[in-house]
Amino acid sequence: GEAHTNDYALYHARAIYEGQRAEQKKDGSNKRVFNLTRSAWTGQQQYGTVMWSGDTSASWKTFRNQISAGLNFCASGLPYWTADIGAFFVKDGDSWYWDGKYDDTTNDPAYLELYTRWYQWCCFLPIFRGHGTDCRRELWKFDGEGGMFYQALLRMNALRYKLLPYIYSTAGKVW
């Protein structure tokens, strides 16, 4: 028979999609399926999947890698991809993968700069989410309401809201 090694993501996405659709038939609703996953396979966009890059560590190198990863991923024909704004792991941890560079988190001006740049970039991704461990992600946690970083984040937040009609209508075309 045919060898299949990495297509579990496709079958997993299909199972979630079909399960949600079956439940919707019972209650008469017709909502779009939304499945946030970090695994991908060709064709799974038909099952309402959104891929994200996984739990990354906060560093400028990781941020640079996220940009190229997002561009390459979307070139594959899967329209929905996102990243954890500012990385998932901010501090340095015990495990090899927990390799953040900012133990003082939002008290470190260097992390505030990195987070702000990441936020500015993610504003233009299909899915916009600040998610992670080690520190809170609310805008006011980033140097207070009068601060330079807070103001930059606020401006990008306003821009994101202005882009929502475009993002939503474009999403409807590819869904």
Give short role names for the model-derived ranges.
Residues 1-175:
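Catalytic-domain carbohydrate-binding cleft regions of carbohydrate-active enzymes
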